[in-house]
């Protein structure tokens, strides 16, 4: 059994902020970009007030996320010590005293929730609910089969509603279904990849999630396919039914006199559907062929085809929703 050691030598205390930052998992902050989704699709991305308040909300949720990850590392200290990779984390490696880490995490959460209360009451409620959900997940829910992935999806849903509450935006049913389906797809895919790594490991019990032993491989495969399909179908319905944002005329409305009714402006988001379908298929390839997927945020940043499809999707969404805002007035008058 690995032994935990911590010393209070000067250099370790000097490096405390650095090790805390590593434990905070900045890469995981990518998940909090979900707060920007209502801002983008509401057509308010370039509204300075709403943009900066969403930025503030993003940093608050990133603080909460970091605090939760530090607490999680303290809870998982014993299992991390025998894990081939997790034992290198600062707390498990003895770089930070667990008590000090726990105190810092609690302080981070207190400051984050205090700042959340200054933005809006509903945002604060969402932040509190998210914090409670993540703590309960770390202590209990992640050990309950199926409930663990539903808790992960609920976290994304709370992020979206938190972002919507900041700008007083309406969130459509199909958009919510898209978020939930995609979150469940990523969570199930993560479990599928973790189980693949577990079965390929010579030591199948040390430092692993116990819940993985209760997930039949056939069940994970079925759920992966189910939520992969639900993700692109729900997004497709969202693009079919999404009305033009209230921020102003879309660039393609300018061509209304030259196009048949088949190409109404409210349907132009359909152009982005193929990129979403490709992204889903590429992620399935990563899970099954490359035997990866246990870290969705890492895959997004390292898999070039997937990253390219996401970037192209984002560019198209911005062009369709905000393109007319960047056309010179003379060109707009000419086209009209």
Label the predicted regions:
Residues 33-37, 55-66, 103-114, 128, ...:
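Generic alpha-helical transmembrane segments of integral inner-membrane proteins
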Residues 40-46, 136-140, 189, 319-323:
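Structural signal for the C-terminal ends of transmembrane alpha-helices
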Residues 49-53, 121-127, 145-149, 170-176:
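Short, aromatic-rich membrane-interface segments at the entry and exit
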């Amino acid at each position: 059994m690995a032994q935990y050691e911590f010393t209070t030598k000067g250099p370790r205390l000097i490096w405390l902020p650095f090790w805390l930052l590593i434990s905070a998992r900045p890469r995981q902050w990518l998940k909090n970009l979900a707060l920007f989704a209502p801002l983008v699709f509401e057509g308010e991305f370039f509204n300075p007030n709403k943009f900066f308040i969403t930025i503030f909300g993003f940093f608050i949720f990133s603080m909460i996320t970091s605090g939760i990850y530090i607490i999680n590392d303290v809870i998982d200290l014993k299992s991390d010590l025998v894990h081939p990779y997790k034992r290198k984390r600062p707390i498990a490696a003895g770089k930070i005293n667990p008590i000090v880490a726990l105190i810092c995490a609690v302080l981070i959460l207190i400051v984050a929730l205090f700042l959340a209360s200054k933005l809006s009451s509903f945002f604060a409620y969402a932040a509190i609910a998210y914090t409670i959900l993540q703590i309960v997940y770390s202590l209990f829910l992640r050990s309950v089969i199926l409930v663990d992935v539903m808790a992960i999806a609920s976290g994304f849903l709370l992020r979206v509603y938190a972002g919507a509450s900041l700008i007083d935006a309406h969130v459509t049913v199909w958009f919510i279904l898209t978020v939930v389906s995609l979150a469940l797809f990523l969570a199930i895919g993560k479990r599928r990849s973790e189980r693949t790594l577990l079965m390929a490991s010579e030591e199948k019990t040390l430092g692993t999630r116990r819940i993985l032993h209760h997930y039949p491989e056939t069940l994970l495969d079925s759920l992966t396919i189910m939520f992969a399909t639900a993700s692109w179908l729900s997004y497709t319905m969202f693009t079919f039914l999404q009305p033009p944002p209230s921020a102003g005329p879309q660039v393609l409305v300018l061509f209304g006199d030259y196009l048949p009714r088949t190409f109404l402006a409210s349907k132009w988001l359909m152009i982005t559907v193929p990129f979403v379908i490709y992204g889903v298929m590429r992620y399935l390839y990563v899970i099954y062929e490359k035997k990866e997927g246990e870290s969705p945020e890492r895959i997004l940043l390292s898999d070039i085809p997937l990253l390219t499809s996401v970037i192209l999707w984002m560019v198209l969404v911005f062009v369709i929703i905000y393109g007319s805002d960047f056309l010179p007035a003379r060109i707009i008058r000419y086209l009209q």
